[in-house]
Amino acid sequence: MKFGGTSVADAERIKRAAERIVRAKEAGTRVVAVLSARGKHTDELVSLAYEVSDRPDPREMDMLLSTGERVTCALAAMVINDLGHEAISLTGSQAGIVTDSGHTKARIIEVKADRIRSGLDDGKIVLVAGFQGVSQESYDVTTLGRGGSDTTAVAVAAALGADVCEIYTDVAGVFSADPRIVPEARKLPVLTFEEMLEMSASGAGVLQLRSVEYARNHGVTIHCRSSFEDGPGTVVQDEELTMERPLVTAVTHSTSEARITLTGLPDVPGIAGRVLTALADANINVDMIIQNEPQSDGHLADMSFTVPRDDVATARESLEALQPELGFGGVQSDDRMGKVSIVGAGMKSHPGVAAKTFTVLGDAGVNIEMISTSPIKISCVVREEHVEEAVRKLHTAFELGADAVLPEDVAGVHRPKVA
């Protein structure tokens, strides 16, 4: 089980989460619960760091940010003990979450779950602080980046061979669009890992991308449910769905995109690889990439790509350091970009989806600035102020509303028992 920040935002919600954990235990389940920091606590810690330092040291940021989850776990353990059950709270390090040394964006290398198993064997409920681990090299505290508690939960589930990893959030499951933008969006009962990966990469905030990748790679079924109501939620699994999938499953969006353009880049073999290697070394994820035709002299071109908005300053610094070596004209950035995507396994076997997408956006007066496609996804970069209108128009055009007919019960689908 994993409870997100809104599910443990205050004392009352921590009590409610603890009561749900206890119910699962009383139903005969051996329970490990991964907990996030309370509400906006992590954001408050980040703001505090920047109040005292213009450029906080990444190692010290990890020391600071890892405290939030520890507070939640300790409080939840107190509640569970008061409810008559024995609980033990563990930091990421104590739980055996071993990572690389990438401070603020560390990756899990392995989970040494001996201490978790020992707690379970003693009949205890084990509470694990999400979002954190310990460096294999330096033994320093590390954090996993935004949404890292999802990854912690899936990694622990995989290490324990758990039947399912239940992710509890403030929404009832995964929807065909953000209900705050599209009120008629419908809940999706089941998704393949392939679909969920594309949705997470395109802005769907219910599950963090790395957690879905980890679940797919280790065969862990994920069950997304609401902390505040009982219901079937959404199951994400690796089994092929035997019924025909709808053409488009969902419309996702992101308003945290930035575009960076390198002007006057010499058009020679290997230079794009050099640029992208520098960004990878800075731990910056590059999404869409386009390079125009060389200019009239045949030797210079412009190269544009998108990165997370929070990484613009670091990306510019890395690229400007390359300028003397590569000899390009300059670095330009625009951080007021957004991305709109349509996702659906049914797109594999249906032509014309891209044409319909571009026509719908064109009729709505939304200019497409960059395009990326995969067999089950089409993504368009647009101005940030056009994102919500684009989402609504595409959701309507592909008939994804509450009255849409989607397969509710699919042969071969494993549906975890509701606790």
Positions of PLM-derived features:
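A conserved regulatory-domain signal marking ACT and ACT-like small-molecule sensing domains
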Residues: 232-419
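Conserved dinucleotide-binding and phosphotransfer motif residues
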Residues: 27, 83, 218, 282, ...
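Nucleotide/pyrophosphate-binding catalytic subdomain
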Residues: 1-212, 382-383, 402, 409-419
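Non-catalytic alpha-helical coupling and interface elements of nucleotide-dependent molecular machines
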Residues: 50, 54, 85, 219-223, ...
